[in-house]
């Protein structure tokens, strides 16, 4: 299994970044490739087990399930259930940490 790690520093306080990230249906507001998104079955977007269904700018669709969410650790983990892009057995974990030299956030 391949493993990819990405990280960046966001010029915003961790509380504000986490508020957006913990909403599993918010990525159409900040991810440039996502056009529209909705949570299936009317579940809350921070409910572990909820499924988001979204469309990309190129017309592809992806369904992902939230499998873990920790406010104390500021960690979110999700997996792809179905996709029209060639991704299989995809699991992602995002963790936020405060940057100590300012009001910024480390996304890992």
Language-model features, listed with the residues they occupy:
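Hydrophobic/aromatic beta-strand elements that line small-molecule binding cavities or substrate pockets
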Residues: 6-8, 62-68, 91-98
């Amino acid at each position: 299994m391949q493993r990819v790690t990405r990280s960046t520093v966001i010029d915003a306080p961790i509380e504000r970044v986490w508020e957006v990230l913990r909403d599993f249906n918010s990525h159409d507001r900040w991810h440039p490739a996502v056009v529209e998104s909705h949570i299936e079955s009317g579940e809350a977007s921070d409910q572990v087990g909820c499924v988001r269904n979204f469309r990309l700018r190129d017309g592809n669709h992806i369904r992902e399930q939230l499998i873990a969410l920790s406010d104390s650790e500021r960690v979110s983990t999700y997996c792809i259930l179905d996709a029209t892009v060639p991704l299989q057995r995809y699991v992602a974990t995002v963790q936020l940490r405060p940057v100590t030299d300012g009001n910024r956030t480390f996304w890992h």
